[in-house]
Amino acid sequence: MQYKDSARLDSSQVTSSSGGGGAGGKMAVGGIGGIIIVLLAMFLGFDPGALVGGTAAGPQQSTDDYAQCKTGADIDTNRDCRFVAYTNSIQSYWSQALSGYQPTTTHIFTGQVSTACGTATSAVGPFYCPSDRIVYLDTGFFDQLTSQLGAQGGDAAEAYVIAHEYGHHISNLTGV
């Protein structure tokens, strides 16, 4: 994928955290079990954190790892800046295409993360939590996609996955 070197990036739309599991007593939920719990929470209106022993919490150990991502040229020296570019592009599109669009953030994590939907591990893959309206992404997912599943497409595939998660945000905002 080609990036315009002069493109300005807004790193405030991307946050990150690493490790940790949030409040004590929580159990990490991943894979199909995690998806089922989140779906049940969405349809039945309950806190999935109650099922795994604890109350829901927001992202822990938040850092500003993306502050150095200022322009498209920064992607050449720091590949992680591409997540800022994807997020900025997706938010720009929806801000123009959907009247009343409410921006959200992409939260990059490693290992596991506590969300308003409960604690999730990298086994869950990228997901959107409607309770806190945040897109969550463990970048190791893309490595796994390539190494274990043979996926190809590079940056375009990554952007597609993130855009898909933002689609859940749009559904949440519009009630569809």
Model-derived features: where do they sit?
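Short pre-active-site segment immediately N-terminal to the catalytic Zn-binding motif
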Residues: 141-160
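Short, solvent-exposed loop/turn and secondary-structure capping segments
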Residues: 52, 148-149, 172
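Acidic helix-start/capping segments at beta-turn-to-alpha-helix junctions
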Residues: 67-92, 99-120
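Structural recognition of the beta-strand scaffold that forms the well-ordered cores
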Residues: 27-30, 135-138, 169
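Catalytic zinc-binding patch centered on the HExxH motif and its immediate surroundings
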Residues: 54, 112-138
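Active-site recognition of the HExxH zinc-binding catalytic motif
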Residues: 39, 94, 137, 160-173
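Long amphipathic alpha-helical segments used for membrane anchoring, targeting, substrate engagement
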Residues: 1-68
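A mature extracytoplasmic/lumenal domain signature
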Residues: 110, 139-141, 174-175
